Curated annotation (Swiss-Prot):
GO molecular function, one term: RNA polymerase II cis-regulatory region sequence-specific DNA binding
Gene3D superfamilies: Homeodomain-like (1.10.10.60)
PROSITE patterns the UniProt entry points to: HOMEOBOX_1, HOMEOBOX_2, OAR
Tissues with expression: In the adult, high levels detected in the eye and much lower levels in internal organs such as liver, gastrointestinal system, heart, genitourinary system and pancreas.
The family this protein is said to belong to: Belongs to the paired homeobox family. Bicoid subfamily.
Motif (Nuclear localization signal): 260-264
Protein name, per record: Pituitary homeobox 3
Gene that encodes the chain: pitx3
Chain intervals for the UniProt region annotation (Disordered): 1-69
Top-rank taxon: Eukaryota
Any Gene Ontology CC annotation: nucleus
DNA-binding region coordinates: 60-119
Biased composition (Basic and acidic residues): 37-48
Length: 293
C-alpha cells in the first residue's frame, strides 16, 4: 500500500482534509475566504495603479488645431492691422473663422512670439553683415590715429615738450604757421597793388580838370602826402590786422573822416577861370545915337 504523507504545514492548515485515498483536499467552507483575499489584493493593485493612470492622462497633449487656408488668411490680415486684439475683436474673429475665442487668443500669442523672434534675427543679421563692414571700413584703430601721443607721461611733460608741438597738422603746415606759436596769423600787407594803381590814376584825373598849374601841383602834393597814404593803406587793410588798439574799426573811421576832409580841401583849392565879357568896339556915345528916340 502507498501512503501519501502530509507535510507539517498541510497538516496544520484547517482547510485541508484527507480523502479516502489519503490525498489532501480543500475544505469547501473556506472558498469564500480565499475569494475575499483575492478581491482585496486586486483592489489594492488597482488603487496603486490609479495615480499612474492620472499622471498619464495629464501628460497627454491636447489635439492640435488644424486651420484652413481661409482661417489663416483672415487671422493674418487681422494680425497685420492689430497685433494685440482685445476681447471683442477676438470674439468677432472667432465668429468669422468658426473658431473659439480661446483658440484665436492662443493663435495670436504664438504669432506674436514668432514675429518677435524674426525681428530679432533680422536685427542680428543687419548688425553682423550690413553695418559691421561699413563701420570697420570707416573707423580706424586708436593706435594709428593717436600714435604721437603718450598718455602715460602726460602729467610730467611741460608745455614746451607737448606732443602737439611735434604733431603735424595739414592746415597749419599749408599756412606755414605753428599751432602753438604766439605770432598773429594774419599780417597787414606791405604793398597793395590796387592802392598803387589808384594813386597812379589820381594825377591823370586831376590833370584833366581845367585850372592853373600851381593849383594842380599843390593838389598832387596833397595827394602824395603821408597822411593820405597812411589813410588809404589803413582803409584797405584787413580789419584783423589792427592789433594796436582794442577797437577794430577806429582806424577805418578816422581814415574815412580824413579822406572826406581832404576831398573838401581839394574841391576848395580848385581854381576855375573867370568868365570874361566880350569886348565891344562901340563907345557909349554910339550906344546913345543908335537908340531910337
Amino acid at each position: 500500500m502507498d501512503f501519501n504523507l502530509l507535510t507539517d504545514s498541510e497538516a496544520r492548515s484547517p482547510a485541508l482534509s484527507l480523502s479516502d485515498s489519503g490525498t489532501p483536499q480543500h475544505d469547501p467552507g473556506c472558498k469564500g475566504q480565499d475569494n475575499s483575499d483575492t478581491e482585496k489584493s486586486h483592489q489594492n493593485h488597482t488603487d496603486e495603479s490609479n495615480p499612474e493612470d492620472g499622471s498619464l492622462k495629464k501628460k497627454q497633449r491636447r489635439q492640435r488645431t488644424h486651420f484652413t487656408s481661409q482661417q489663416l488668411q483672415e487671422l493674418e490680415a487681422t494680425f497685420q492691422r492689430n497685433r494685440y486684439p482685445d476681447m471683442s475683436t477676438r470674439e468677432e474673429i472667432a465668429v468669422w473663422t468658426n473658431l473659439t475665442e480661446a483658440r484665436v487668443r492662443v493663435w495670436f500669442k504664438n504669432r506674436r512670439a514668432k514675429w518677435r523672434k524674426r525681428e530679432r534675427n533680422q536685427q542680428a543679421e543687419l548688425c553682423k553683415n550690413g553695418f559691421g563692414a561699413q563701420f570697420n571700413g570707416l573707423m580706424q584703430p586708436y593706435d594709428d590715429m593717436y600714435s604721437g601721443y603718450s598718455y602715460n607721461n602726460w602729467a610730467t611733460k611741460s608745455l614746451a615738450s607737448s606732443p602737439l608741438s611735434a604733431k603735424s597738422f595739414p592746415f597749419f603746415n599749408s599756412m606755414n604757421v605753428s599751432p602753438l606759436s604766439s605770432q598773429p596769423m594774419f599780417s597787414p600787407p606791405s604793398s597793395i597793388p590796387s592802392m598803387n594803381m589808384a594813386s597812379s590814376m589820381v594825377p591823370s584825373a586831376v590833370a584833366g580838370v581845367p585850372g592853373s598849374g600851381l593849383n594842380n601841383l599843390g593838389n598832387l602834393n596833397n595827394l602824395n602826402s603821408p597822411t593820405l597814404n597812411s589813410a588809404a593803406v589803413s582803409a584797405a587793410a584787413c580789419p584783423y590786422a589792427t592789433t594796436a588798439g582794442p577797437y577794430m574799426y577806429r582806424d577805418t573811421c578816422n581814415s574815412s573822416l580824413a579822406s572826406l576832409r581832404l576831398k573838401a580841401k581839394q574841391h576848395a583849392n580848385f581854381a576855375y577861370p573867370a568868365v570874361q565879357n566880350p569886348v565891344s568896339n562901340l563907345s557909349p556915345c554910339q550906344y546913345a545915337v543908335d537908340r531910337p528916340v
